[in-house]
């Protein structure tokens, strides 16, 4: 019972946070994805949502765009100190549309750095996909 209490609740308390140095990224982040298809010079911008579900022992990431959803297969959080927090993950991407001519399935990798701006948490970084796409992500925590 003590492990469960710590895993789900206690580690999020400010006093405990100051001792364990594990950042709590739990919440919903909204923002923009700016991408470039390989070989093309035009940039595309899309609205995106990242949902982070975190306990002391586990973390899951679900990334949603207008036409697809990505789920993290492997996640790494690097915490050098409270000002240098990096989140890396490998993901599978699935199509929302159901259209046969869309090629929205794939895999990829993402790296985001946590930044504080005007008291708000931001996750910013890059992604690369097996569909020869790459781009920049700029997200802000909304809950």
Where are these regions (language model features)?
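Short, cysteine-centered beta-strand-loop-beta hairpins and adjacent loop/turn segments enriched
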Residues: 36-41, 68, 96-100, 132-133
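N-terminal glycine/threonine-rich, aromatic-flanked beta-hairpin/loop signature
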Residues: 41-77
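Contiguous, well-ordered beta-strand patches that form the walls/edges
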Residues: 65-115
């Amino acid at each position: 019972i003590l492990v469960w209490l710590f895993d789900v609740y206690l580690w999020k308390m400010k006093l405990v946070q100051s001792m364990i140095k594990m950042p709590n990224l739990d919440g919903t982040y909204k923002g923009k994805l700016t991408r470039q298809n390989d070989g093309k010079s035009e940039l595309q911008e899309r609205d995106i949502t990242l949902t982070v579900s975190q306990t002391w022992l586990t973390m899951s990431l679900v990334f949603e765009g207008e036409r697809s959803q990505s789920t993290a297969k492997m996640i790494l959080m690097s915490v050098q100190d409270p000002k240098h927090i990096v989140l890396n993950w490998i993901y599978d991407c699935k199509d929302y549309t159901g259209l046969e001519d869309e090629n929205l399935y794939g895999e990829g990798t993402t790296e985001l750095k946590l930044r504080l701006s005007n008291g708000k948490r931001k996750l910013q970084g890059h992604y690369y996909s097996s569909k020869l796409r790459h781009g920049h992500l700029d997200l802000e925590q909304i809950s």
